[in-house]
Amino acid sequence: LKGDNMKKIFYLLIVLGGTLTLNVNAEEYFYKNKNGILLNENEYKFFKDFYTENYIDYITEDIYNDFLNNGFFDKKVFSTEYNGSNLLTRGAVHETNSKLIRMSKVCSSHCKISIVAKWKKSSVVRSYDLIGIYLEGGNFENISYAKLFSDGTCVENTETKKTDNALSTTIKLPTKGNSLEIIQSFDVKKSGIIYSSYQHAKKSISLANSRKFSFSKYGYGNVYLFDESVRSYYDAMQGVSINLN
């Protein structure tokens, strides 16, 4: 072959090689979040099912590596779904006309749990709501602060009350904004039963009064046993549960 033909063939191989590389990368990565984390389509769907679509943009490198290194992407996300009076086999969800609560688990050597409380329409009262968990027969590990998503913003909530087997986070609902979504997550050993509850304040209540409760599986949502002086402030929404055994 003459020199010019050799150059053309060499150039063609470079172009084809570059195109192949681009196609491989395009297939490998489906989404890039705000933190620069690259997810393939399976990982994106996994996080959407386990958390929500809003949460995906806030996944950090540490969170991603934790799921990857523990083999969670190869496991099935499981829950039981409660809708009205019907028990469904899709997620641990209790749903009303205005809001829902869902609890999901994925297990390897230990389990990861996510709890999602979501408003389906705008809340009229914006005061101190509560999202909590009660663990029967186990202990928590690696608890993350609850995140409140509203109209594209994300705020971590650090006002918590905790015991060895229970946790509650106080959520001050924003005065403005729709599409409210609250997510709490943590790790736990593969034993026991987890109860979760989201309690909405039906009328304005102070932060101090919102903390007047003890933890009990016999309380509201199997988590909150309110002091009589504040019991009427909360809506007594039914909770959800998941067996870890």
Which role does the model predict for each range below?
Residues G18-L20, L88:
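Intrinsically disordered/low-complexity terminal segments and short unstructured peptides
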Residues K8-I9, E28-Y29, N70-G71, K76, ...:
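Short non-domain terminal segments
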Residues Y11, F47-Y51, D74, S79, ...:
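Compositionally biased, low-structure terminal segments
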Residues L1-N5:
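Short, Lys/Arg-enriched N-terminal segments with co-localized hydrophobic residues
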Residues I9-G17:
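Sec-dependent N-terminal signal peptides
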Residues L20-A26:
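Sec/Tat signal peptide C-region and signal peptidase I cleavage site
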Residues A26-N97:
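N-terminal propeptides/leader regions of secreted preproproteins
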Residues G84-N245:
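Mature secreted bioactive peptide module from preproproteins
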